A protein has these predicted regions:
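Phosphate-end processing signature that detects enzymes handling 5′-triphosphorylated RNA
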Residues: 1-191
C-alpha cells in the first residue's frame, strides 16, 4: 500500500506536438500499455466529491487507486488488488482496502453501489527530466484518441516554472485540461 501527494501539471497536445516531444525527449524509449478501468456510482458520487476510483492493469498487475483532493494536488491511495476488472462489473465496497472503504463510506457510497463503467487504454512513455518525471501519453477510449504531456513534481512552484519552460520550447501556452477520468465520462455522455 502507498499513499502519496500527487502534484502534476498536464497539457493536452495535438498529434504533431506529441511526435515532436517524443522525438526530443523519448527517442530511445518504448511505450508501455496500461488500461484504466473507471469505477463510479450510477449517480456519480465520486465525481461530486472531486474524486476518482480506478483499477489500473499494467504488465499483468492490478492496482486500485482512489484519488481525493488535497491542499495542493491530490492524495492517492494505491493498493495492489486481485480484482480482474471488466466493464459492467459490480465492485463490492467491503472487498476493497480499509482506507479506501473508509473514504467511500464518508462519501455515502453503499456496499454494492460501485461498478466499472468503462476503460481507457494508454500508451505511456516516461523519462526523468530535471529531477522530475516527464510523461507522454497517447490515450484511447471509445472512438477517441488524445495526447497529453504530464509533469509529476515534488514542489508546486519549482515544478510549474520547469513545466512552463518546457511548454515554451514547443510554443505551447499552459491550458490545464480536465483529467482523463473527466474526459472519459464527458465523452461517454455524448455517445
Amino acid at each position: 500500500m502507498s499513499t502519496n501527494n500527487e502534484i502534476e501539471f498536464k497539457q493536452l497536445i495535438d498529434f504533431n506536438t506529441y511526435n515532436a516531444i517524443k522525438a526530443s525527449y523519448f527517442k530511445q524509449l518504448t511505450p508501455f500499455t496500461q488500461i484504466n478501468y473507471y469505477i463510479e456510482t450510477p449517480s456519480f458520487k465520486l465525481r461530486d466529491h472531486r474524486s476518482a476510483l480506478r483499477i489500473r492493469v499494467k504488465q499483468n498487475t492490478f492496482e486500485i487507486t482512489l484519488k481525493v483532493p488535497a491542499k495542493v494536488g491530490l492524495i492517492e491511495y494505491n493498493h495492489p488488488i486481485d480484482i480482474k476488472p471488466h466493464i459492467g462489473q459490480t465492485i463490492v465496497k467491503s472487498t476493497l482496502p480499509n482506507d479506501i472503504q473508509k473514504i467511500l463510506t464518508e462519501f455515502d457510497i453503499g456496499e454494492n453501489e460501485l461498478s466499472v463503467l468503462g476503460a481507457l487504454t494508454t500508451e505511456r512513455l516516461e523519462v526523468e527530466f530535471q529531477n522530475e518525471l516527464l510523461v507522454l501519453d497517447k490515450s484511447q477510449y471509445f472512438d477517441k484518441t488524445d495526447y497529453e504531456l504530464e509533469f509529476e513534481v515534488n514542489d508546486y512552484e519549482i515544478g510549474f516554472e520547469k513545466f512552463q519552460n518546457l511548454l515554451k520550447q514547443f510554443n505551447l501556452v499552459h491550458e490545464p485540461p480536465k483529467n482523463k477520468v473527466q474526459r472519459f465520462f464527458e465523452y461517454q455522455a455524448q455517445l
